[in-house]
Amino acid sequence: MNDYYFPFGQKLTKVQQTETTPNKEVFVLGVYASAVHAKWLDNDNRVLVQALAVASEPEIFWTGEGVEQIIAAISIPPELGRLVPANKNLNGPSGKALDDLFLQPLGYSMARAWLCDLLPESRVNPNQKKAVKYYNERITSTNYHLPVATIPDFDVHELEKNAARRKDEIVAELEASGASTIVLLGDLPIRWFLHFFDKRTKLSDFGNSQETYGQRHTISIHGKDYTVIPLCHPRNAARLGAHSSTWAEWHETWIKEKGKK
């Protein structure tokens, strides 16, 4: 992986499962890692950027712990103001949603889950592009000796380009986990991982109704049968930003009626 940098100089790092003892109960596959977000204030406490991605998450599906210390460790020239944690709902929302709205209803804990993403690094989503552009314009117009922010945009073609290689890496993690149950978060893990082993390519292919949502399916991967539970992306389940109200409603009902083991 090339070296990429966040605003104010933190290097992009891979975010992968670190607690790798086997015999996990469930393997969870998402899309790409999130980031630590800061609010950027000028020296008069005026907000320059409400939420600026400034570092890789400290752990996969991070839930926001220690955000103050992470941001305090990022140095910023005094003339450029200061960084403070972004609004509470902007650090660790996917991790919190995964724990509260996916794992707990299924009877699992984070400690007994092996977590994985199709892309094990942060990417810039459309909402961040404007913030990154503003940072780059500010630091290139003056002599602050800060690196230009270069975190790549999220591009589904990157998933396609690396799909075969990542498939093998994900299978290796799956086998190392010892889990026999797989939870897939949204369309992209189905299209760019599961489709190597199954004809379906998106969540609605498993059923497009409340009755079919969240059902368990037996799928063979490299000669071993796994219980696969395809669910919506945490963004939808937790109604984070732009989301599908239909999937959100189906997920809420699934929690109430089908989520328990």
Feature map (PLM): residue ranges:
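Short, well-ordered beta-to-alpha junction loops that form the rim of enzyme active sites
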Residues: 31-33, 118, 184-189
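Hydrophobic/aromatic beta-strand patches that form the interior of the parallel beta-sheet core
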Residues: 27-29, 114-116, 181-183, 227-229
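Short, flexible loop/turn elements at secondary-structure junctions
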Residues: 30-33, 120-122, 232-235
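Proline-aspartate-enriched helix->loop->beta-strand connector
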Residues: 170-190
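Short, surface-exposed acidic-centric catalytic microdomains
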Residues: 61-63, 67-68, 92-151
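Short, active-site-adjacent cap segments at secondary-structure transitions
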Residues: 35-36, 122, 189-192
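C-terminal capping/extension of enzyme domains
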Residues: 1-10, 49-60, 128-171, 190-261
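Active-site and ligand/interface coordination hotspots across diverse enzymes
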Residues: 1-106, 169-177, 217-224, 250-261
